[in-house]
Regions:
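Conserved active-site and SAM-binding loop architecture
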Residues: 1-219
């Protein structure tokens, strides 16, 4: 099976699919991540691959301009950021296979018109072994093949929070005063902040495999 990973970044989801024996083709404009294609997704020629070439497509478009916490770095380019997401959805539609696209649940992407009506699941990273909460929305077409763990909340807290009433780290770099999100001055590294929990990635990869297999003709 083959997966296409758009905005591969640190390769969290790539590794999960590779652990299941999938061939992964990745795209990112940052050469430091060693993607298969170093390219801007807006100009990348995805039609070099035929429809059906991939059995799953994953997208992690940059969340910077969708972040409600953005206070530096110049004006917010919401139009440009939304165009990247539109291009991602265009590519997913072209290949006609199950797909998933993630972005912070607290961001502005979920309010954009192009996302309305798309199926999604919300997850929190702390439920998958990370020391901070980071509520994330995963739009996807995995249907009943993926049943994510409950979102961390007072009614269903993750283990670290239920034991101590606080998450050991914050999902923000630098100082934070968010209640329940930080302890003893700890904060996560940039590498970890830009990664996804392996447990979550493995769960999604397994669900993708199940979704693909359910589409195969019965023998």
């Amino acid at each position: 099976m083959r997966a296409l990973v758009l905005f591969c970044g640190t390769g969290s989801i790539d590794k999960a699919f590779q652990r299941l024996g999938w061939e992964v083709t990745s795209v990112d404009w940052e050469s430091k991540y060693a993607p298969t294609h170093v390219a801007n997704i807006m100009t990348w020629d995805y039609r070099q691959y035929a429809p059906g070439a991939f059995q799953f497509v994953w997208g992690s478009p940059c969340c910077t301009h969708f972040s409600r916490a953005r206070t530096t770095g110049g004006p917010r380019d919401l139009e440009g950021a939304t165009a990247l997401v539109a291009r991602t959805l265009e590519i997913m539609e072209y290949f006609g296979c199950p797909w998933a696209l993630e972005n912070p649940q607290t961001g502005l992407l979920k309010d954009q018109a192009l996302m309305q009506g798309l199926p999604y699941s919300d997850v929190t990273y702390c439920a998958y072994g990370y020391p901070y909460k980071k509520k994330t929305r995963v739009w996807n077409t995995l249907g009943d093949k993926w049943n994510p763990r409950p979102v961390c909340c007072k009614a269903s807290p993750c283990p670290p929070f239920s034991l101590e009433g606080v998450h050991p780290m914050s999902a923000q770099r630098g100082a934070s005063k968010v209640k329940g999100q930080r302890r003893n001055g700890d904060n996560c590294s940039q590498a970890q902040l830009y990664s996804m929990p392996p447990q979550l990635c493995d769960e999604i990869a397994q669900a993708a495999r199940d979704a693909v297999e359910s589409r195969l003709p019965s023998q």
